[in-house]
């Protein structure tokens, strides 16, 4: 009987840990849109991706209530390459503010872009 109770308790703990539905970040429809751009980067798809970036940055949801990691950097780099250098650099710097662990990588990227 004791063995049965321990088995049930263990099963309950394991199953309850698998049922977590809360997410740290909200990705909206980032994945299919970014895949479509990677597959065929048409101007229309890039504009759609830019709208997704704006929504991810300006309307963050999820438990952390902040943009997902890498989004500010990706969007900043895209804007920089499209001629919006000042805005792009601001977003790259925001990535560092939000995720200090990205300082080395994003800092080097900023240095390369400013050359």
Question: Where do the language-model regions lie?
Answer:
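C-terminal motif of bacterial Sec signal peptides marking the signal peptidase cleavage site
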Residues: 14-17
